[in-house]
Regions:
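Bacterial N-terminal signal peptides
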Residues: 9-19
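Bacterial N-terminal signal peptides that target proteins for export
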Residues: 1-11
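Low-complexity, glycine/serine/threonine/alanine-rich intrinsically disordered linker
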Residues: 28-39, 189-245, 257-875
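Residues embedded in well-ordered secondary-structure elements
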Residues: 16, 80-82, 92-94, 107, ...
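Extracytoplasmic
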Residues: 28-201
Length: 875
């Protein structure tokens, strides 16, 4: 007999009721979430299109790093192409607004470069440009005047027409062409604002949100007992207490209140039609509605009397936050130490949310993308503390995960000292002159006064709080001792800073809300929570000023600061820290597809094998970043009509994989490369559900794992993590070929595997989610059949009332019922923001957040701003 499912989300109170009676066949027209575009990009009078990132790379064109030739090239790179005389490179660039422009071309010159013609839309605009030069360098700027351009992609052609008599040939027959950048200068020299979609409207007016079909009046106590006896007691009553849940004890309001978490479990299972199981007698819809109304009323009454939540445990900074905080406190030019947490590495800035526009192409490297890791901008001789573990179903910023042992405390003392004593510190630190250096002719007394003046604002920033006189005296006294001993102002200030970096007031985030009951955060605490939420770092001076005068406690000022901080490049921390953990992308690092079964996944560089997951991992993060920068709907994470991929990753999704038949050595690129925006028409692609990264990291070495994939979807997309599996699980074949040799599909074999009732209950929820992705093999490539020829069954049902035939229809159900994902995403983000697990007491706040987010169709900034204005965030 199936048991009561034991996994649930204590917060899914308001919207799961609308799941119960949805007629999936009568779906509303789907809302176009791509129309949501919030932050308006400023269209400046001059726009620079970088050759290596903003032009489509076609044919033999590629990005080339030019740092070995000097610092002349914009972005340290250019677009490189080669061909024989008569061949052309056809590419394009983006025009933001129609108008008349002057185009300024910056080309590269070199010994093996040819003579070019330039055409726009097939019309010659410049002829016989000789790019030969005895030395590698930049050509004189070339201006093409008074060109009328339409908005959108503009075609441009470079035709190789000949060569200088002194030019050398490239690879015996070809000549090269290099494009550093193209500048578009508007003739009227005006500032424009790009048009964006109107996102006004309300939840009630939107066709995108399903309405609850039935509402019921609450049952009386006797009616509730009779209903449960009729439909539930056979498995959960009296002696039959499967899942350790005896519903015969829940016949009174008092029991429902005192066992509120079990009450919530009951409610969720009934609302999602998980209970009663499909093979049991089902209550009529009207009865189910009245049961829910009864339990909802009890939960609502409980929440009225239990507004307070568990306090946030005082926690230390995790490794990523500590590096960011030191970087911003000391104004370092890069990171303090290597950070594997920063998946994407770049050598040019591309994340500019204030612009409202994400680049069409980005040159990036993965944190472990082979032999060319970008780690130059760190301090040598500085060793970080151990990586912080991610909490189960959560993030690595929770207090119960971030304690300080005596060994770790000692490492902080050593770490602070190693930072200021690093050989590169003076050149790496932007405040060396303004903070660590005194005038050469300053007397001892003047140095004492100067140090005290500099320490006051420094300590306020480091400790995120007002600096008491006693604290200032203590650090100034330590400076005086060091100055007497060393007679060096710079070294004495470094000694003080080393102490600050090891101070509990720097290392710990401490809030008054640690006391019992709800305690509103003071202005400094609120500034700290906000900055570590959005930036994973310290407040800046603007935010500190709002905390200092108390204005940050005003809702309009807090909202203004939130919007300002979202437009700061430091908000990229949300992608680097939140998105990476939310998507569980670290699991891809340890994914090991069988090298014999999937040789195309590996490339040997030297003595080491590198996995293609290095490229896969970048794709969902760039999608997330583009959503942030352009303030789009988070529903694009479910289904998007664009993505960012390298050429090799783009081929990975196709039927033919060019490098599949190459030998293992240097099979694919493991170094820095370009990820370009790709428009998608195949809805089997797009979003994070069907990203190769997701599909690969949730597979076994020899086959797919519908259980792991289903658990990932339940956890990440619905915030409904399944419980840990039983200690003893009957083995199942690790190789799908062994299963298929028995004439069975993986779905049929897993059904045999469910030998007891508890297995059935859990698998009934997660298996359909996993099998929806079964058309993708263990490395994320599409297949229509199993290798044996057996048909793949990707059908399923979501929450007992939303059938789907394949993964596209699963996406359609999620788009038709966006509150499912919007609630889960908001819960994940809120939990990350307040650094603790959510509780039932947070449900009213989540409902308020969801209402605002739904009204704005999931716009990213609305998620963030609603969380910051919520009760849990401010208390």
């Amino acid at each position: 007999m199936p048991t009561f499912p034991i996994f649930f989300n204590v917060l899914s109170v308001a919207f799961t009721a609308s799941l119960v009676f949805i007629d999936s066949a009568a779906a509303q027209p789907r809302f176009d979430y791509h129309s949501i575009r919030g932050r308006q990009p400023l269209l400046m009078a001059t726009k620079r299109c970088e050759g290596e990132t903003d032009f489509e790379l076609r044919g033999k064109s590629r990005a080339q790093d030019m740092r070995n030739f000097g610092a002349l090239w914009s972005g340290d790179a250019h677009l490189l192409w080669d061909g024989v005389v008569g061949e052309s490179l056809q590419t394009s660039f983006e025009v933001d607004a129609a108008g008349v422009y002057d185009l300024v071309l910056q080309l590269t010159i070199a010994p093996d470069y040819g003579i070019l013609d330039v055409m726009l839309d097939g019309t010659d605009v410049c002829q016989s440009i000789d790019t030969y030069n005895a030395q590698v360098g930049l050509a004189p700027l070339l201006t093409i005047s008074d060109v009328s351009l339409a908005v959108g992609r503009q075609a441009i052609t470079f035709k190789l027409t000949g060569s200088n008599v002194q030019a050398q040939k490239f690879q015996a027959s070809n000549y090269l062409m290099g494009l550093d950048y193209l500048e578009l200068k508007r003739k009227d020299n005006s500032l424009l604002v790009a048009p964006v979609a109107d996102i006004s409207g309300s939840l009630a007016d939107s066709d995108a949100f399903p309405q609850q079909a039935l509402k019921g009046a609450p049952l009386s106590t006797d009616e509730l007992t009779a209903t449960m006896k009729q439909f539930c007691f056979r498995c959960h009553g009296g002696e039959a207490t499967e899942a350790k849940l005896d519903l015969s004890l829940f016949g009174t309001r008092e029991t429902l209140l005192t066992r509120i978490e079990d009450t919530q479990r009951i409610r969720d299972a009934v609302a999602r039609r998980e209970m009663p199981p499909k093979d049991e007698r089902q209550p009529p819809d009207a009865v189910r509605a009245r049961m829910l109304a009864t339990v909802d009323a009890v939960i609502s009454d409980y929440l009225k009397d239990h507004r307070s939540h568990s306090p946030v445990v005082m926690r230390r900074l995790n490794r990523y936050e500590y590096s960011n905080a030191v970087r911003d406190l000391l104004q370092l030019r890069g990171d303090v130490y290597p950070l594997p947490e920063k998946t994407i590495r770049v050598d040019n800035l591309y994340f500019d949310p204030a612009s409202g526009r994400f680049p069409n192409a980005v040159r990036v490297s993965n944190r472990t993308m082979g032999k060319e890791q970008i780690e130059e901008k760190i301090l040598t001789s500085v060793s970080p503390f151990a990586i912080d573990l991610q909490a189960d179903g959560g993030f690595n910023n929770r207090g119960n995960q971030l304690s300080v042992s005596p060994i770790l405390l000692e490492s902080f003392l050593t770490l602070g000292r190693s930072i200021v004593d690093s050989p590169e510190f003076d050149a790496y630190c932007k405040i060396t002159d303004s903070f660590f250096t005194s005038p050469q002719d300053a007397t001892l007394e003047q140095q004492q006064i100067l140090a005290r003046m500099r320490l006051l604002p420094f300590l306020e920033l480091a400790f995120r709080s007002p600096v008491e006189e006693a604290v200032l005296n203590r650090y100034h006294g330590y400076f005086s001792q060091c100055l007497t001993k060393t007679n060096s102002f710079s070294q004495s200030m470094k000694d003080v800073v080393a102490g600050v970096l090891a101070s509990p007031r720097f290392i710990y985030i401490s809030e008054s809300a640690f006391e019992d009951g709800d305690v509103p955060l003071n202005a400094y605490e609120l500034a700290t929570r906000l900055s570590f939420f959005l930036w994973s770092s310290l407040p800046d001076e603007i935010l500190l000023a709002a905390a200092r005068d108390g204005s940050l406690l005003k809702p309009d000022v807090l909202d203004l600061q939130t919007r300002r901080m979202l437009e700061d490049p430091r908000s990229q921390a949300l992608a680097q820290n939140f998105a990476r953990q939310w998507l569980r992308l670290d699991q891809l690092v340890t994914a090991v597809p069988d090298i014999e079964r999937f040789p195309q996944y590996y490339s040997r560089i030297g003595c080491e094998q590198w996995g293609f997951g290095l490229q896969m991992m970048v794709e969902p993060l760039l999608l997330f970043e583009s959503m942030m920068v352009e303030d789009r709907s988070v529903m694009l994470l479910i289904d998007s009509n664009y993505t960012y991929r390298s050429d090799e990753l783009q081929a990975w999704y196709g039927a033919d994989l060019p490098f599949a038949d190459r030998e293992n050595r240097n099979r694919f690129n493991t170094e820095r490369q370009q990820f370009s925006k790709r428009l998608l028409t195949d809805r089997r692609q797009g979003g994070v559900l069907t990203a190769a990264a997701t599909l690969t990291m949730t597979s076994s070495p020899l086959r797919t794992s519908p259980i792991a994939r289903g658990a990932w979807v339940a956890t990440v997309i619905f915030n409904q993590p399944p419980p840990p599996p039983p200690d003893v699980i009957p083995p199942i074949e690790a190789d799908d070929k062994v299963i298929e040799a028995q004439g069975l599909t993986l779905r049929e074999r897993l059904k045999q595997h469910q030998v007891n009732a508890s297995c059935v209950a859990c698998h009934a929820k997660i298996d359909p989610l996993g099998f929806a992705l079964e058309n993708f093999d263990a490395i994320g490539r599409w297949r229509d059949h199993y290798s044996s020829g057996l048909e793949i069954d990707a059908t399923g049902e979501l929450f007992g009332s939303m059938p789907f035939q394949n993964v596209v229809e699963l996406k359609d159900q999620l788009l038709a019922h966006p509150e499912l994902f919007l609630r889960a995403f908001s819960e994940h983000m809120l939990s990350y923001a307040i650094a603790r697990k959510l509780e039932l007491e947070d449900a009213p706040a989540v409902d308020e957040i969801l209402s605002k987010v739904s009204t704005d169709h999931g716009q990213f900034s609305t998620v963030i701003r609603s969380i910051v204005q919520s009760h849990p965030f401010q208390n």
